[in-house]
Regions:
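PEST-like low-complexity, intrinsically disordered acidic/proline/serine-rich tracts
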Residues: 2, 21-305
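Bacterial N-terminal signal peptides
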Residues: 7-18
Length: 305
């Protein structure tokens, strides 16, 4: 079971607290900090295996693209540039928390953002102060499930629904395409993954609207907030038989002065039909062990200073 890299996180976090505290006038840097002298990873040279420990063939670069089928998103998909492309540990792909990509916060949105204490990005805090709800095994929720650790997904279609099964958190979403509207203007029971309805805009573009999202979730891994008024639009455009592009737009006038694209034509590649999705789960027992070995000692250490 791939449990959100709990063991590597323990090692990294433990090493972090053995380092001297940052000077107060030193701006925070993303953790773990990249090695400026490291060569870029060529993911095409990595051995790629699925959840069944079987090799996944790398498609030939000169392979001619077959046309996209009509009204069909079904299949198993992974980030076309390699699994690292979907990690997004510094936040949404189009707006990483790097001090350069500034979101259009409302005053309330900025206040809510500052109240969130992530372990990554320009507002990162020591692990003792982190308040990421996913770190206590709350459901990751939507849209964060597509904006953090977007790995393999499997899309199934029925007459009335499109179902998306995610490797991350081993969960799924139902998207109704039978013409229904949202339950009401004021959805009284928000959901971790919201209420989703979709329709075909043309032969190869499926547009999804999602509302009724639980405001306790974060939009991404660096604590971008949302309100109960959040609407998310996804555009799944099947460019060819093997490539699917995903654009995800955040619409929340309570927190942001205008809509913004968290993903823009993010490419996913079709995998073989016998590709097995790995298991990635937040385990409460492993999280408890992490707290025992890392979080509690860090909190105790911070109180001594």
């Amino acid at each position: 079971m791939l449990s959100r890299f709990v063991v590597p996180t323990i090692v990294l976090a433990a090493s972090m607290f053995s380092l001297p505290a940052r000077a107060q006038n030193t701006p925070p840097t993303p953790f773990p900090a990249p090695d400026p002298g490291a060569l870029p990873v060529d993911q095409s040279q990595e051995k790629h295996i699925d959840g069944w420990y079987r090799d996944v063939p790398v498609p030939p670069k000169d392979q001619k693209a077959a046309p996209a089928p009509r009204h069909d998103l079904s299949g198993i998909w992974e980030p076309a540039a390699g699994w690292r492309d979907g990690v997004q540990f510094l936040g949404a792909k189009e707006y990483p928390s790097d001090g350069k990509h500034i979101l259009p916060f409302t005053p309330l949105g900025e206040k809510a953002f500052k109240a969130n204490k992530p372990g990554f990005g320009t507002t990162e805090v020591p692990i003792a102060l982190n308040n990421d709800p996913f770190d206590i095994c709350d459901p990751i929720g939507f849209p964060r499930i597509e904006l953090f650790n977007l790995r393999a997904i499997q899309i199934l279609q029925t007459e009335k629904q499109v179902l998306i099964f995610y490797q991350n958190d081993r969960t799924f979403r139902s998207i109704w395409k039978d013409g229904r509207q949202f339950p009401s203007q004021d959805i009284s029971e928000p959901r971790w993954y919201g209420y989703s309805i979709g329709k075909w805009e043309d032969d190869t573009t499926f547009v999804v609207q999602t509302a009724g999202l639980d405001a306790r979730t974060w939009i991404d891994n660096v604590g971008r907030p949302h309100s109960g008024d959040l609407r998310v639009e996804e555009r799944f455009h099947r460019v060819s038989h093997d490539i699917l592009e995903l654009t995800l737009t955040i619409i929340d006038p309570t927190m942001y002065t205008k809509p913004w694209n968290a993903l823009s034509k993010f490419p996913l590649r079709l995998q073989p039909a016998d590709f097995d999705l790995r298991e990635m789960l937040c385990s409460p027992s492993e999280q408890a062990e992490f707290d025992k070995q890392v979080s509690r000692p860090a909190i105790a250490d911070s109180k001594k200073k």
